[in-house]
Each structure stands twice: as C-alpha cells, then as structure tokens.
C-alpha cells in the first residue's frame, strides 16, 4: 500500500528567516582582541573572544545591537573570571561608562537615557 504524495501540499516550502544587519560596534573593538585586556593592560594579543552586549536583559540586548553597543571580550573578562563583565559590577559599569561617552559623541543624552534608562557618567 503506497500513498501518492505528488498532489499534496507537503512538505511546505521553507521560509527563510530574515537576518538583521546590525551596526558595527561604536567602541574601538576588534575581533579576536579582548577590549578590556587592551584597554586596561595594553595586551593586544589575539585570543578566543566572545561578543558582549553592553546593555543586556529584557529586550535591551537587541537595542544594544542596533546601537552598536557591543565589544569582544576574552572568556575570563566576559564570564568566568573574578573581573568578568557578568560577575563584577565595577567592570560592567566601566563598560557602560565608556559606551555612554562614545554614544553621546554622536547622540544626545536624552537618546542615551531612552536607550539605557540609566546615567553611568
């Protein structure tokens, strides 16, 4: 017993998901070089890096992407170390201060407040 599938509307044609094209980072961050290692220690060696969204959580990650508020961080500075951006409030706020300074060079303070909801300067 075989079924003729030729006149059935299946499988449905796959719909491609549209990719969002986000701005490049507004901070001077290069792929493979940890932003914090370079800024704090002068270490410009190539490392395994992960993209860190400076504003994250409750829909702010997408807005962070659109505004270019992201940097490449090595794994210890991103999630595992004592001074990791996800573990250390001082490091997270340092990144937010730097990002706010850069953002406000081309935008107003009111635009930053609408985006981030907090003043870090």
Question: Language-model features: where?
Answer:
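Alpha-helical and His/Cys-centered functional microenvironments
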Residues: 6, 26, 56-57, 81-82, ...
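Histidine-centered catalytic micro-motifs
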Residues: 49-57, 74-81
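Short Cys/His-centered divalent metal-binding micro-motifs
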Residues: 70-94
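A boundary/linker detector
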Residues: 1-48, 93-121
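Short glycine-/acidic-enriched loop or helix-start segments at secondary-structure transitions
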Residues: 45-46, 61, 86
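Short linker/helix segments within small regulatory modules
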Residues: 55-70
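Residue-level detector of alpha-helix boundaries and kinks
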Residues: 19-22, 58-59, 88
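Histidine (H) residue identity feature
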Residues: 21-22, 52-53, 77-78, 86, ...
